[in-house]
Structure formats: structure tokens, C-alpha cells
Amino acid sequence: MSSHDTLLSPVNVGGLQLNNRVVMAPMTRNQSPDNVPTDANVEYYRKRAAGGVGLIVTEGTCVDHIAASGYPNVPYIHGEDRLAGWKRVVDAVHAEGGKIAPQLWHVGGMRKRGVAPEGDVDGYAPSGMNMPGKVNRYTMTTSDIDDVIAAFAKGARDAKAVGFDAVEIHGAHGYLLDQFLWEGTNQRDDGYGGSMAKRGRFVAEIVAACRSEVGSDFPLILRWSQWKQQD
């Protein structure tokens, strides 16, 4: 057996049959005007599937919350036109024999005011910080937390409905979920801050809400990392 045989062999992951173990990681492209996946996005992902990638994880796609986005021209996963755009991407990838999952994204405190189309909306953060010691963002209430959990669950449900094969939840790189996990940016004194278990509660509730929407046999992926862009 060569060193590449295992990498290129098929694998079944929680009922998801992949042609090989090559996974394309998410990469933001900023190529979706009006936050709608376009012909260019369709072709971009189609080519990766045609090249033989076993599983494509899309660029971060923002959930249905007013402060989810922090960058221009990134795709969203809510709204009729945007979901129709993603369906075209999914269909193109499937036509090439590939599998694809969206990365559901909320940037949290990394959002700055002025980013279109939401404009003058603050970044949302567990303790009003985009990095330790700098209180310069909006501090989320428990009602806000509930709204974001619901937005992730809705994104997972809609992703499954348009034909995605799995869903990845972005919990890494200093964005909102990571801001809750990180003691440096989570100084809350309620049920979502303090101990590691409490700091992880928000993430756990998002995963549970998504699971409730997609069912027990649909693959869910949680991405997390030690590295943060604030490092």
C-alpha cells in the first residue's frame, strides 16, 4: 500500500459516503455581490469537485442575524435569492460527483460599523470586546443569545433543504462562538461565562439546536481552533 492509498480511498462518515478523504477547507472569497452566490461561485466550487475533492466546505456563509457579517460581498444563507444561489452551487458539485457542506458563520465582535448591507450595526460580543481588554462592541443579552442560536438552527435547516450533504458550524478563529469559548473575551457572570463548561454552553446550545433541525442522521461538523486572528 502506498502512502496515498488511505488518503484517496472512500470513507463513510456518519452516513456520509465520500469518494476520498480529501477535504477542502473554507476560504473567504468576497465574490458574492448582494450576498448572493453567483455564476462565478458556482463554477469555483464545481471545478473543485471536478478535481476530485471528497468534501468541499464552503467559505463562511452568514446566518440570519443582523450582525452576523463583518465583510463585504460574502454569501449569506438566508433569503430566497441567496438560497437559490446556493442550490445552484450544490447541484453543480453533485453533478461532478462531489459532496459539499456550508460553513455557518457569525463574526461576532469582529464586525465593525459600516459594513454593507447592514450599515450602522455594532458587532455583537459576549462581553462587548473584540479582543481582550477592549470594550468597544455591543454586549449580548440572553435574548440576543437566543436569537443567534435560532439563526444557526435556521441556517442548518435551510442548508439541508437546498441539498447540502452536511453542515459545518464555524467556532474558530476569534469569531463569535470562539469569543464565548475564550476567557479573554468572555467575562460574563451569567450562565454563559465563568467556568469552561459555562463558556462552552453557547456553542453546545447551537449544536443541539442545529441537530434538532436536521435530524440524527445528518452530519454536523464543529470547527474550532487554538489560533485566533487576535493573536
Feature locations, PLM:
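N-terminal capping/small domains of soluble enzymes
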Residues: 1-107, 148, 156
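Short beta-strand segments
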Residues: 25, 103-105, 170, 223-228
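Active-site glycine- and acidic-residue-rich loops that bind
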Residues: 35-36, 149-153, 158-160, 192-205, ...
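Short acidic/polar active-site loop segments enriched in Thr and Asp
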Residues: 54, 165, 220
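Glycine-rich, proline-tolerant flexible connector loops at the mouths of alpha/beta enzymes
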Residues: 57-83, 104-117, 168-194
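Alpha-helix-loop-beta-strand connector modules within alpha/beta enzyme cores
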Residues: 73-101, 182-220, 226
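Non-globular sequence segments
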Residues: 105-164
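Active-site-adjacent beta->alpha loops and helix N-cap segments on the catalytic face
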Residues: 117-129, 133-142, 176-209
